[in-house]
């Protein structure tokens, strides 16, 4: 609770004026403003209107396409490691890994390895295991594919609001695991699955990470939150735009709304 209150106080008191201006470049159609990702080299991954996976270069130009061979809805993309890109199909309970050329490396059906829950969200860990959020049993699990078993199981029944939880995203970043709950905020765990606290930013559809900051779109602003000092800064976004999420590169900012992404240059 102390962590939660400290973060809330810092966020309220440390607002800084925006330091950068945005210059519009171009737009692209897409199918989802939340099924998005960015790798450590600055490439962006989105789903086109036909739900094919597109990789865009740092300027927002299409580089590669992956057309899934079978039907299914890609619900999560994790591409931070461009050598091993994760696609999670919630409806099929399947995790697909792609290489740097967007070619399949492996496919794992969670039901084939006796995973008894219903995974709502999935992401990669630094040791090439999978983090899974089990919606049925309200558990954070770590799946080791080499052992074909769970190596971490953290019950969340005393942490989550049973009546209102709505987990949208998970991400391991700098040896911590961040779980985004739309209604309650961001839950933070260490890389052993131990609960460390929460960050009370509610109503978020997606969170991104850049250096030591977490960022998100809310109330017409792109908000940045320092993971270590709890300071925050914000950038006013163009008026009249219903932006939902963002991906921030070194020179480009990708702002996502329903049906398209607008690409801007930082200045």
Regions found by a protein language model. Give the residues of each.
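A short beta-strand motif characteristic of beta-propeller blades
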Residues: 21-28, 61-67, 106-112, 149-161, ...
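Beta-strand-rich domains and repeat architectures in extracellular enzymes and scaffolds
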Residues: 26-49
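Repeated scaffold domains used in trafficking and secretory/extracellular systems
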Residues: 31-37, 72-78, 116-122, 162-169, ...
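Conserved beta-strand positions in repeat-built beta-propeller and related beta-rich domains
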Residues: 38, 46-49, 86-91, 132-136, ...
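Short coil/turn segments that connect the beta-strands within blades of beta-propeller domains
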Residues: 41-42, 82-83, 127-128, 174-175, ...
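WD40 beta-propeller blade core
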Residues: 54, 96, 141, 187-188, ...
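Short loop/turn segments that connect beta-strands within beta-propeller blades
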Residues: 57-61, 99-103, 144-147, 190-194, ...
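Blade-level signature of beta-propeller repeat domains, shared across WD40, Kelch, NHL, RCC1
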Residues: 245-267
